[in-house]
Design a protein with these regions (language model features):
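A conserved acidic beta->alpha catalytic loop
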Residues: 54, 72, 86-97, 113, ...
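Juxtamembrane C-terminal module of membrane proteins
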Residues: 20, 25-52, 258-259, 280-290, ...
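Cell-envelope/extracellular polymer assembly enzymes that use nucleotide-activated donors
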Residues: 51-54, 84, 229
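Short, acidic, metal-binding catalytic loop of nucleotide-sugar glycosyltransferases
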Residues: 71-82
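Catalytic donor/gating beta->alpha subdomain of glycosyltransferases that bind UDP-sugars
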Residues: 154-187, 222-226, 231-297, 370, ...
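Long helical/loop segments within the catalytic core of UDP-sugar-dependent glycosyltransferases
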Residues: 30, 110, 119-120, 130, ...
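Short aromatic/hydrophobic "clamp" motif used to bind/position activated sugar donors
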Residues: 133
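Acidic helix N-cap motif at the loop->helix transition within catalytic regions
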Residues: 64-68, 82, 93-102, 145
Length: 396
């Protein structure tokens, strides 16, 4: 049974490292680095030094939020003569284009065929003439200083992409979907900030990120995580991804856990797809520190850890009856059983619309990992589908 014991402890270590250990190690490495070399402060560019930029919004049937989004765009603290607002509304068959026609500041590209968001990005980028392009979603609200903060990050010539912060608007009445997603993004934002301080953030969220126009590489139209693929291909070109917490996008959480499940399964499938398409980044001799960050922060989560997580309990059960130290394994088994029990209780309460943050954590954690497994099936079903179109989750 030595082999099973070794497998158990390796699995336990990988699960711990993926979700907790990497964050701890990352924090230590950042502190060590900054003891020897602190980043030099860069001044905020004056108005006359601000570059022209394009705010790029790929939208499909967003009639309900068009006016609110345009109001938000025009309220941003950036010179109007240096800001272009580009909408790509391919496939939209509601009143999105009609509403946009009332806004002379909006440049609208539309074709009747819906080919997915990635195809819309590939098409729209040819109409971008500014050195910087900021991508954002139609249903998100940007803070007033977002564009200036993003431009500030680009004053470092090594930075090829800037990731803004994603925030979930959570109200007391919200369900487990909003509460769980909000907690997840707070943790994820902390990791991104530490990643960027060590070397580079590992990806950007599509709600708000920006790239240098010259570094944009067209993607396969069946790409599921366009924001992730696009940002990491910029790293492959020798640039870094800066993280800017002072530029943030706020959106509502998913309407319910069924809608959140759609998102998580698609993201998991997109993660698996991304690992294959970004496989050169797995070369530590070429990408060094970033390879370590990429594997620790993303690859393990999407490829291996969820399998090992659910393998731990049956392995643990076997080891209780087959090793010379059954008490140790019995204690670990009880801790696992308690965690699963709390997750199940959290699920029950969410069905009753009763909010309990303590129980939402194990529930949402297990929910995410179950949907990573479902991502394999989602990706298999899409095999041969050249379109990146997907059913978007309803927001609260």
């Amino acid at each position: 049974m030595k082999a099973l014991e070794v497998l158990f402890w390796i699995s336990l270590f990988i699960v711990f490292y993926t979700y907790i250990g990497y964050g701890i190690l990352l924090y230590i490495l950042v502190k060590i680095k900054e003891c020897f070399r602190k980043p030099a402060p860069r001044p905020m560019p004056a108005d006359d030094a601000l570059p022209p930029l394009t705010l790029f919004i790929a939208a499909y049937n967003e009639e309900d939020v068009v006016d609110e989004k345009m109001h938000n765009c025009l309220e941003l603290d950036y010179p109007a003569d240096k800001l272009r607002i580009l909408w790509v509304t391919d496939g939209s068959n509601d009143h999105t284009n009609e509403r946009l026609s009332h806004w002379p500041q909006a440049i609208v590209l539309h074709q009747p065929q819906r080919q997915g968001k990635t195809a819309a990005l590939n098409r729209g980028i040819h109409f971008v003439e500014t050195p910087l392009v900021v991508f954002t979603d139609a249903n998100t609200h940007l803070n007033r200083e977002a564009l200036r903060e993003i431009v500030h990050a680009f004053t470092d010539p090594k930075v090829g992409c800037v990731a803004g912060e994603k925030r979930i608007a959570v109200q007391s009445k919200d369900n487990a979907a909003s509460g769980g997603e909000g907690l997840y993004w707070k943790y994820e934002s902390t990791l991104k900030a530490l990643d960027a301080r060590l070397y580079s953030a590992v990806g950007a969220a599509g709600e708000l990120f920006a790239v240098r126009r010259e570094l944009f590489e067209e993607m396969q139209t069946d790409t599921l995580l366009d924001d992730f693929i696009l940002s990491l291909r910029i790293v492959m070109q020798g640039h870094t991804i800066a993280y800017c917490a002072n530029a943030y996008a706020v959106e509502s959480g998913s309407a319910d856990m069924r809608e959140e499940e759609k998102r998580k399964v698609r993201i998991a499938a997109g993660g698996l797809q991304s690992i294959w398409r970004l496989r050169p980044l797995l070369n530590p001799f070429r990408y060094g520190t970033f390879c370590f960050q990429y594997i620790s922060h993303r690859v393990l989560r999407w490829s291996l850890t969820h399998i090992l997580l659910f393998l731990l309990l049956p392995l643990n059960t076997i080891l209780i009856f087959t090793t010379s130290t059954p008490l140790l394994y019995a204690i670990i088994w009880l801790l696992q059983a308690l965690f699963y029990l709390m997750g199940s209780w959290g699920y029950y309460l969410s069905m009753k619309h009763i909010k309990n943050k303590i129980l939402f954590i194990p529930y949402y954690f297990l929910f995410m990992n179950v949907n990573v497994i479902r991502g394999f099936n989602y990706l298999h079903k899409r095999k041969g589908n050249a379109s990146g179109a997907w059913e978007k989750a309803r927001r609260a």
